[in-house]
């Protein structure tokens, strides 16, 4: 390797500085990988390349890592900082031997034998000039630009054409101390290290570029030859009394309507546009858990992303983040309503495939779509779909639509060999640009059809949207899920492939709910969501600034000291910082008087802010319920609190997709924190510290509307034990409207008929609609709910339930 200060390298670095823009994966190697700044470090690269090492040098300087040009000096032994598996490839002739690099491995291993305390980190580094995966009918451009082992001339062309799309990826370090102790220090282990590294680099390239792209028409012909589609075409011809040729043409039309037409060139252009867009809209995108997903890709999993659906921005945000995290943007299942010009063709070339809202018993369409999905899985493309089926208008997760999840499980049952893993993804925003439209729709306004004019209208409203949040939840590998749900599933399917297993539908429902629960497990508690939660629980939606900051400090402490799950993320900074962020985004108003500043939510903004509160209300619903128990009782035992929480938790779990694994432990941890923070005192029983009552009342306020709903339901059930589910749903909704009108409840979900349906289904499952005479459970929960309400609200509910027009 030429010396760092040689004229040749200086010239090369100057050229690259002006032609090359490098993206680092992961963005912070020290935070995301196992790198240790206190230990010596060497880099491993696949191929010796002056331009690659020059690009690496630029990045290591910025990251505070050792320069690849600095030799590694250990115990008097001088070795290159970069170890390459292959020598340079000349324009003509054979590649240079890799023996010098194997000898370097040997020297490093030998030093470990001499110096027992030494532990050099070997860090694999992959460089990519562009990320074109290539096509099955590859073009000359791909041949020139996208070879894995380019000559110096081809590398020059790659830098010229693809220098703005250079990616440098660091991987977890390998301990040479471990290798030396476990496997020895001879030439054999050096060769083994080289082989393992080659496999690693090959897998990394597959993760970064994705599988080879098919020719779209060739893909159609391949799908039409499949046995299941041929059979579906024959059945279509017979049932519609048309020729097989006509049925085949219909199938081709369906394929053309459905199939993506992924274009790497468009993705590169979109990356530039989206970088501009995110920088204009957001002050930052916060990401948690990407490394575990990158590892799943590396291990050969077929990845299916299942995000929550807040906004049309979701399609763009997740793909953009995955691209910058060194993974290929997925093929996205988009509603056919988004297939309008010009967005539809652009989405299609960005990887979207389109799905009808309903298949309406169309067997041919179903067969075509299923076969296309199978093909995506078989070829190794990652897939994304929204299991809610549409965007949430209230900020809460919607009940899942199980169609796509069922199709994914069916693909596994039909014999996908690779592990198929669902990745729940929580997407959050400090500002959702459609939120005002959502509340118009909830108030009865008809939903507007998507069009290019809506796009232009949205662009006009672009402004400071704060921050975005992408949290990857705990993955679910479907083969493992099936082993847990139906241990003999492989045998059953092999014995009768055409027979639908009896356990399949219940399993799909369980899986869908598990996905939604794990999305909520990965929630992001941000400045906007936390501040909305506090202010909406206060009288008049307003608080003194110092009290608001103190309450936020309590909530931050609660989330950090008693974490909801390890996948949840919590805003940085203290309460003062969070309030300032919210004010800068103009989400809250501030006024001053001689006694201090007051932060409030404007009356016309209150409904809007419930959307953001609802994103994270599940994180605080149990602490809020505990606070309600404490503030409504002068003294209460831990056992009594746990009993109340146990009674309400099944409904909370169904309504809010909660997944607390050890509820008694969680309740006790929350109580212990309250005691430690001086909010509660404990002798034989628990009681609120008088000076801290206001904080506990604020926390208790977050569960009040939920308890009002439960009080409505259980008062109705206790008063009319034999009422039907449909009656309970309609009368609960009617009573909720009355309660809202009398007590000023504006949260849209309070009047959501679907929510009362969800609760009635859960009540039936829990046995509250049974014919047994003993209704003591219903009466107990009714009394508990009533005891936790304000007297005026309780009186309205009890009086309304016993009123003549309800019964």
UniProtKB/Swiss-Prot annotation:
Cystine connections: none
Membrane topology: Peripheral membrane protein
Molecular function, one GO term: glycerol-3-phosphate O-acyltransferase activity
GO biological process: CDP-diacylglycerol biosynthetic process; fatty acid metabolic process
Homology family: Belongs to the GPAT/DAPAT family.
Listed GO CC annotations: plasma membrane
Pathway annotation: Phospholipid metabolism; CDP-diacylglycerol biosynthesis; CDP-diacylglycerol from sn-glycerol 3-phosphate: step 1/3
Taxon lineage: Bacteria, Pseudomonadati, Pseudomonadota, Gammaproteobacteria, Alteromonadales
Domain notes: The HXXXXD motif is essential for acyltransferase activity and may constitute the binding site for the phosphate moiety of the glycerol-3-phosphate.
Major site of localization recorded for this protein: membrane
Residues spanned by motif HXXXXD motif: 308-313
Top-rank EC class of the record's enzyme: transferase
Compartments where found: Cell inner membrane
SMART domains: PlsC (SM00563)
Its EC number(s): 2.3.1.15
Substrates-to-products reaction catalysed: sn-glycerol 3-phosphate + an acyl-CoA = a 1-acyl-sn-glycero-3-phosphate + CoA
Keywords: Acyltransferase, Cell inner membrane, Cell membrane, Lipid biosynthesis, Lipid metabolism, Membrane, Phospholipid biosynthesis, Phospholipid metabolism, Transferase
Name this protein carries in UniProt: Glycerol-3-phosphate acyltransferase
């Amino acid at each position: 390797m030429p010396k760092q200060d040689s004229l040749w390298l200086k010239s090369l670095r100057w050229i690259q500085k002006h032609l090359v823009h490098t993206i680092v994966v992961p963005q912070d190697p020290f935070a995301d990988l196992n790198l240790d700044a206190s230990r010596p470090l060497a880099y491993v690269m696949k191929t010796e390349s002056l331009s690659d090492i020059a690009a690496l040098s630029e990045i290591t300087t910025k990251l505070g890592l050792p320069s690849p040009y600095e030799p590694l000096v250990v115990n008097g032994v001088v070795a290159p900082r970069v170890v390459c598996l292959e020598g340079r490839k000349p324009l003509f002739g054979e590649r240079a031997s890799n023996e010098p690099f194997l000898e370097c491995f040997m020297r490093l291993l030998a030093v470990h034998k001499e110096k027992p305390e030494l532990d050099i980190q070997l860090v694999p580094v992959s460089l990519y000039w562009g990320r074109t995966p290539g096509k099955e009918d590859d073009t000359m451009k791909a041949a020139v630009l996208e070879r894995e082992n380019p000559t110096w001339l081809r590398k020059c062309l790659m830098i010229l054409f693809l220098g703005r799309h250079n990616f440098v990826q660091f991987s977890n370090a390998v301990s040479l101390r471990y290798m030396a102790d476990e496997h020895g220090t001879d030439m054999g282990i050096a060769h083994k290290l080289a082989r393992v590294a080659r496999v690693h680099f090959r897998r990394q390239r597959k993760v970064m570029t994705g599988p080879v792209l098919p020719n779209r028409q060739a893909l159609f012909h391949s799908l039409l030859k499949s046995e299941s589609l041929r059979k579906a075409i024959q059945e279509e011809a017979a049932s519609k009394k048309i020729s097989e040729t006509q049925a085949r043409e219909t199938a081709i039309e369906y394929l053309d309507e459905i199939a993506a037409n992924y274009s790497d060139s468009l993705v590169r252009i979109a990356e530039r546009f989206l970088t501009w867009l995110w920088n204009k809209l957001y002050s930052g995108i916060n990401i948690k858990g990407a490394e575990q997903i990158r590892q799943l890709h590396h291990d050969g999993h077929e990845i299916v992303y299942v995000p929550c659906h807040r906004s049309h921005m979701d399609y763009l945000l997740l793909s953009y983040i995955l691209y910058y995290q060194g993974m290929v943007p997925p093929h996205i299942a988009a509603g056919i309503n988004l297939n309008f010009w010009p967005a539809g063709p652009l989405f299609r070339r960005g990887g979207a495939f389109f799905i009808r809202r309903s298949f309406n018993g169309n067997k041919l369409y179903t067969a075509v779509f299923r076969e296309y999905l199978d093909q995506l899985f078989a070829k190794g493309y990652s897939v994304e779909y929204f299991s809610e089926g549409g965007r949430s208008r209230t900020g809460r997760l919607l009940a899942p639509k199980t169609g796509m999840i069922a199709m994914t499980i069916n693909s596994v049952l039909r014999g996908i060999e690779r592990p198929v893993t669902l990745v729940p993804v929580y997407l959050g925003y400090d500002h959702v640009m459609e939120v005002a439209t959502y509340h118009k729709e909830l108030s009865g306004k008809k939903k507007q059809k998507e069009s290019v004019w809506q796009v232009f209208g949205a662009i006009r409203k672009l402004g400071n949207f704060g921050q975005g949040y992408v949290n990857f939840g705990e993955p679910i590998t479907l083969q493992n899920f099936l082993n847990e749900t139906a241990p003999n599933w492989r045998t059953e399917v092999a014995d009768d492939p055409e027979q639908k297993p009896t356990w399949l539908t219940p399993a799909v429902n369980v899986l869908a709910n598990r996905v939604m629960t794990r999305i909520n497990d990965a929630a992001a508690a941000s400045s906007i969501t936390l501040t909305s939660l506090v202010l909406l629980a206060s009288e008049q939606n307003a608080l003194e600034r110092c009290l608001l900051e103190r309450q936020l400090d309590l909530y931050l402490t609660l989330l950090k000291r008693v974490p909801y799950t390890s996948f949840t993320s919590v805003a940085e900074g203290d309460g003062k910082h969070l309030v300032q962020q919210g004010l800068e985004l103009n989400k809250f108003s501030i006024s001053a008087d001689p006694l201090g500043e007051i932060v409030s939510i404007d009356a016309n903004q209150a409904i809007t802010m419930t959307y953001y509160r609802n994103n994270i209300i599940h994180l605080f619903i149990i602490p809020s319920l505990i606070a309600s128990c404490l503030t409504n009782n002068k003294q209460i035992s831990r056992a009594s609190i746990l009993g109340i929480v146990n009674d309400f938790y099944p409904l909370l779990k169904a309504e809010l997709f909660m997944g607390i694994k050890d509820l008694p432990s969680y309740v006790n941890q929350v109580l212990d924190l309250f005691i430690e923070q001086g909010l509660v005192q404990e002798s034989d029983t628990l009681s609120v510290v008088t000076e801290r009552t206001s904080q506990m009342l604020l926390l208790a306020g977050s569960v009040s509307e939920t308890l009002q709903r439960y009080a409505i339901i259980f008062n109705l059930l206790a008063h009319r034990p034999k009422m039907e589910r449909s009656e309970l749903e309609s009368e609960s909704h009617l009573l909720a409207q009355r309660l809202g009108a009398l007590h000023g409840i504006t949260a849209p979900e309070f009047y959501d008929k679907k929510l009362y349906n969800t609760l009635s289904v859960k009540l039936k499952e829990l046995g509250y609609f049974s014919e047994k005479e003993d209704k003591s459970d219903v009466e107990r929960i009714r009394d508990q709910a009533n005891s936790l309400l304000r007297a005026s609200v309780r009186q309205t509910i009890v009086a309304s339930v016993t009123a003549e027009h309800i019964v």
